[in-house]
Amino acid sequence: RLDTWLPIGGTGWYVVKDDFDMVIASKWPIVQSWPSLSRQFAALIDLPSTYATDLLFTAAHLNCCTADATRQNQCDEYVQFVQDAKSPGGQVTVPNGTPLVYAGDLNSVGFAQQLTTLRTGDIQNNATYGPDGPMDWDGTPFTHADCPQTDARMAYTWRSNSSAYPSGLLDHLFFSDAAATLAKSFTLRTDVMAPVALSVLGLQSGDADKPANLQQDAGTAGRANLRFLKSGRLRSQGSSCGLDPSGMFLVLGG
């Protein structure tokens, strides 16, 4: 069905699904996936030989609302996964310099420590998830992509006029800037987009009537090309979608 919705030619999409609500679809083969993380789904994407390494991408849909302790545990668990990936042994090991990308609906409505943990590797429950460690290969924190809306001076990624919650930045993209270069990042919002722009882009005004994360990272000199989209139209129906406009990978989730 995905090949019908978004045809890319060739062998079509490579797809893996976790046991919760996330799907990762890639133009390139998916070497391995790790569905064991709590509400987080990691996959190693086999990039073409023009890239120095493959890409380790993790989609996330963390617990909502007042579940701060659960979200913190999930963030701690992802940091543990990254530390494992960057060192020999364990459940996953990737070569030095492999681009690491973490993106999705983090439901970040509670304590700021959760985002701090994802960015810096500052684990809160060390007894369970092990020691802290830097997230990027060069010993620095992950980079957080700022994604202002395309057609409004706003940066929130979620809004509901019928909800008690205010508009908020709930969806995020973190990446290792030692291995990937950010070229563009923005949040797609079609309901206020000019008709001529909609026509050029092949969009309709209702496609993202709620803000939709469209975050684009493009690399140079063999560095990783990364793209992620969270579709507002699907999100308004209780789903979310990540899309690479150039066809590298697609992420679907709740």
Which stretches of residues belong to each language-model region?
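Metal-dependent phosphoester-hydrolase catalytic domains
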Residues: 35-38, 87-101, 107-254
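A shared catalytic/ligand-binding motif for oxyanion handling
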Residues: 53-61, 69-75, 162
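Beta-strand-turn-beta hairpins that frame and shape the catalytic cleft
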Residues: 28-32, 39-64, 254
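Active-site surface patch of divalent metal-dependent phosphodiester/phosphate bond hydrolases
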Residues: 1-36
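Stable alpha-helical elements in mature extracytoplasmic
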Residues: 1-2, 21, 71-81, 111-114, ...
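Loop/turn elements at helix/coil->beta-strand transitions in domains of secreted/extracellular proteins
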Residues: 8-13, 31, 50-56, 95-100
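A long, amphipathic alpha-helix that forms part
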Residues: 68-94
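Active-site-proximal beta-strand/loop segments in catalytic clefts of secreted hydrolases
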Residues: 15-21, 25-28, 58-63, 102-107, ...
